[in-house]
């Protein structure tokens, strides 16, 4: 594994490396994007904020920067990311490259906020890419799984530093369906978690607030990220272990965790402190993005499959909204989306669950999250993305020898 400390060093490493060349980040992708028997690159020595342009509302960061490490320096500069997911351990290059997202009907993925990037090609050339320079590469490269080249710097749109107030509560699932449009439109961020064998959901909203920011709670490690302590995660993992050993208790455990509403209540924090949540229970995950208008029908059908087949497990289904974008391989290309995520505890076989629900996602025209488990390959994926052929043409032009394709990506990209 090679670990460059500068863009020049990165370019030399890529130019001279034995293929396939892949970049490893924080290991938060479930798909084998980084596996290689060639050259593995780490950008851990290429981290930090390069600069903040307050007038243009943008910040440039080094590609190896972890999302959690950007929060405080950006905040100190008076800005924050416009949106994040509930995990902030990822490297920004990997999060952008796979279309990682949070929730919010007026907010896109992290990729949609990319205003420019610097890309090291297979030949070791460094390209500056933006709407005004190498525009085609910028258009296609914002979500590109590292198959066009290696990011060295990324420029993101940012907002003036802001506070968010979080509210969590339990509501009947039937009420959630009736009020879904209203809840989506009334809040900057809305999502819910549904334990499919329960009749209630755990809803969550985040809205901009001027309330005083309370001191973070929990251990010192959690304080810097504004997270709650992880006692509830330990209880939840115990429940997962019980369900693995005694599958018949899955339903009662799901109803217990729903009605216990772990994490219920309200709190206010700076945005970078409140977006992330403690995630200490390991799992495997599948996520698809379906048209937003079909989201409620799709998740209900997913839950019905789980109930009908009595598939054991304790993890909830997660439901979020993401705004459409124009990125060629984005799951949100040209359509507002609802993302639906199913999880299985790492101690259990995930295949029975994922094999059962994936056809439901296909029925609704779902596009898979690039970093999460799915079974689609190039022939099927090409039917989901109108710009597929144009992207593949761009990829072959930039990397004619397929230097950035490992075995998995050859199947996904079509060789």
Where are these regions (language model features)?
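Structural signature of FAD isoalloxazine-binding scaffolds in flavoprotein oxidoreductases
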Residues: 31-50, 102-124, 150-157
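C-terminal substrate-binding/cap subdomain adjacent to the FAD-binding core in PCMH-type
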Residues: 115-308, 313
């Amino acid at each position: 594994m090679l670990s460059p400390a500068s863009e020049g060093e990165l370019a030399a490493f890529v130019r001279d490396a034995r293929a396939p060349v892949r970049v490893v980040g924080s290991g938060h992708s479930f798909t084998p994007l980084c596996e290689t028997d060639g050259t593995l690159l780490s950008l851990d020595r290429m981290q930090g904020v390069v600069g903040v342009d307050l007038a243009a509302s943008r910040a440039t960061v080094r590609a190896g920067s972890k999302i959690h490490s950007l929060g405080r320096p950006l905040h100190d500069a008076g800005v924050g990311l416009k949106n994040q997911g509930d995990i902030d351990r990822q490297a920004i290059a990997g999060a952008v490259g796979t279309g990682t997202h949070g929730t919010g009907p007026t907010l896109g993925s992290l990729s949609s906020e990319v205003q420019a990037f610097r890309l090291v090609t297979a030949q070791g050339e460094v390209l500056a890419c933006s709407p005004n320079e190498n525009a085609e590469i910028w258009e296609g490269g914002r979500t590109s799984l590292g198959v066009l080249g290696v990011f060295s710097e990324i420029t993101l749109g940012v907002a003036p530093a802001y506070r968010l107030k979080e509210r969590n509560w339990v509501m009947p699932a039937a009420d959630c369906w009736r009020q879904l449009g209203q809840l989506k439109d009334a809040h900057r961020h809305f999502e819910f978690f549904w334990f499919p064998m329960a009749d209630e959901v755990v809803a969550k909203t985040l809205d901009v607030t001027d309330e005083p920011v309370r001191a973070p709670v929990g251990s010192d490690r959690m304080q810097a990220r504004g997270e709650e302590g992880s006692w509830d995660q330990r209880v939840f993992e115990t429940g997962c272990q019980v369900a693995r050993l005694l599958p018949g208790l899955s339903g009662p455990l799901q109803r217990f965790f729903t009605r216990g509403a772990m994490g219920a209540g309200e709190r206010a924090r700076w945005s970078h402190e409140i977006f992330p949540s403690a995630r200490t229970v390991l799992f495997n995950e599948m996520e698809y993005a379906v048209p937003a208008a079909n989201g409620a029908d799709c998740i209900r059908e997913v839950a019905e499959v789980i109930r009908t087949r009595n598939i054991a497990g304790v993890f909830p289904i997660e439901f979020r909204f993401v705004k459409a974008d124009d990125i060629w391989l984005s799951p949100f290309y040209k359509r507002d989306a609802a993302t639906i995520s199913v999880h299985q505890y790492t101690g259990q076989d995930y295949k029975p669950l994922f094999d059962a629900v994936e056809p439901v996602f296909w029925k609704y025209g779902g596009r898979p999250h690039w970093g999460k488990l799915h079974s689609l390959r190039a022939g099927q994926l090409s039917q989901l993305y109108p710009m597929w052929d144009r992207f593949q043409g761009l990829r072959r032009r930039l990397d004619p020898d397929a230097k950035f394709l490992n075995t998995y990506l050859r199947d996904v990209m079509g060789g």
